[in-house]
Amino acid sequence: MARSLVIVGAGPAGMSAAIAAQARGARVTVVDEAARPGGQIYRQAHPALKGGDFAEASERARKERLIGAFERVLERIDYRTETSAFALFKTGELHIASGSRTEVLRADAIILTTGVREIAVPFPGWTTPGVMYAGGAQALLKSQSVLAGRRIVVCGTGPLPIVVAAQILRAGGSVAALAMLNSLKVGGWQLPALWSGRELVREGLRYLATVIRARVPRLTSYVPVRVNGREQVESVVLARVDRRGVVIPRTEREVACDVVAVNYGFTANNELAAMAGIAMHHDPPRGGWLPVVDEFGHTSVAGIFAAGDAAGLRGALVAEAEGQAVGAAAAADSKEIARPDFRAGLAVALAARERLSAFQSAMQQLLLVPSGLWHLPTDETIICRCENVTLAALRDALTAGYLAPNTIKRVTRAGMGWCGGRTCLQAVSALAELHGAPSAAMMTPRPLARPIPLASLANRAAAGRS
């Protein structure tokens, strides 16, 4: 009998896994929160809206190829759009919600391809309307062809701020400044790894060329330290920092703008994996707390797999290659996987994953957040937006000896709000470390892993499934 699979997420890893598993005869269900496939990197506009694609031609070609291949198998799989997976248990029960209805899915295998989210570093004024993630500004362009503002300052680390600044310019927007925390200079020892990802390097250089041609002011080793404006962003103050992330005195520059788009790297969407009791390990450059997996995505819980950025930040190309390998493994039994011809059939995907992972490892040095940045917030700065927990309240708890994330959550309510700690967890953990907490600790995830309508739970209870 064909094996049944549920894949959570329809980004590059999820789509690739679905294609590979269906090709091996598996009965595949794909659950995704978006209305169309693609994930964050290959985000498409909602069918009722018109979005724009301001990416490089080579990236658009990869997107069209993979989404096209996924759409060709849609008639043979169960594809659940606009559906949230909000709980997963080691028994293999996956709880999902769509509209005002909930359902429990069970399958021979579950593949988590839940991706990553952006890291927030609080600073005075970061909750002012007009301050947003750089990825959020990019999502507006991709999904609706909407510019986030009239005059945008893009800040952060790694390649994404450059990409977002270039795409804003290509969409006809105005970038008032591009402030980068880290230099893009690399050492000679990294050249072989960069060569392995030369297609991505070329794309990055073309994005940078767009910014240079537009004569956008570019600042290196600068970060936003304060936003001015009560009801809306009016300007941002940028300051230079040293290698530790500590602000250098008398280096402040004020830039007039109505939007500040910030990215300080990414952390894995690991709530479902942790909730299921999967063994986790801590690897900050690759996304923080990650499930322990083998080369075919097996986790410590039988029948649950992880692939793509959810198993370690390595980008869309690695996610696609890994999704193919993990999808094939999840559709097979242990005897099939042990056969030499199984690995031989995946040789191209496994080689691509290894080659491109080397490139991403070289890039990860650009995504590290230096400890000095966590000193940017003042006592009045809100750390947990959902519960309005300020740095002063958090510091009182830390000074009293409450250093474990779960204890901080109970004492201050930081992480108890609508987002479940997804926005503030990095900041809370980093600030706790400054007070002597262990460097590797995480909040215990609880259902609901994603916000869902109360009507969904009410309807479930009314049907006798409390």
List where the protein language model places each region.
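Residues forming the flavin
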Residues: 1-412, 417-418, 422-466
